[in-house]
Amino acid sequence: MSPRKRDRSWPPADAVVPLAAPVTDNHTHLPVPADAGGPGSEAPLTAAELVECAAAVGVTRVVTSACEVTTWEESLTLARELPGVRVALAVHPNEAVLHAGVRETGPDGLEPRAQEHHGEPLDSVMVRLEETLRANADVVVAVGESGLDFFRTGEKGAAAQREAFRAHIALAKELDLPLQIHDRDAHTACVEVLEADGAPERTVLHCFSGGAELATACAEHGWYASIAGPLTYPANTALREAVAALPDDLLLVETDAPYLPPRRWRGRPNASYLLGDTVRFLAEQRGMGEESLCRRLQATTAAVYGTW
């Protein structure tokens, strides 16, 4: 008998019961033609379909992160065409490495996959990022995601990431925008850079993955922790303990779709319409009613990103 094939299809649109009150997915990646591939690409759903499914279950607003230069313009178009959509723009730390001309193999063992657009130097890309942010203030609500990813890069790449991270911090402060931070295997280094340069007033640790030490830093500095599907994974006891120690008013929720779905959908594409599983898990963990948590999350989202 052949091994059972894992189901990689999209979870059904009615997989999650509608939430008791509206919430915002403050970090997702809506599909655009320039970024084809990844989970769900075999039978893709359009951005419009994903937004419609999300709204039907109470996820009424989303912030889509466009962190490769090839996705900026198409993501801005989505925000102007689809209800409830806004954009965060940045150069992802792993993209920054390629724009800096670094081609070293990182700790993950994967060879870097440079494409034609990576020939544009990092300093030129950062100039273009600032221009794009300024020109699209009507639909841009954050700078992100930027930060450090030591899982995917070596020593030379880490230097390029730090340079880019510091440039994003300065840009977010200059434009008075929130900063969404990508932090993978780099908790201490991220905190050191933020403390050295001075973090933006609204700093969000996207897909929070830290332990007690990072939670303490967030609480001390007033940085926001954005909670995603990994909170629900059985092995992540330290993550749950860290999140439990954070105050309610520093919590946001996200999917980071199409990656990292909540536990019962692991191995399948993630989407904003599945966010309810994470919200309900978080409510149970904190001993809060679902509606109360939703309203608290929405108020915090408004404090960080404004309303739309």
Where are these regions (language model features)?
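Mid-domain alpha/beta scaffold segments of enzyme catalytic cores
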Residues: 1-308
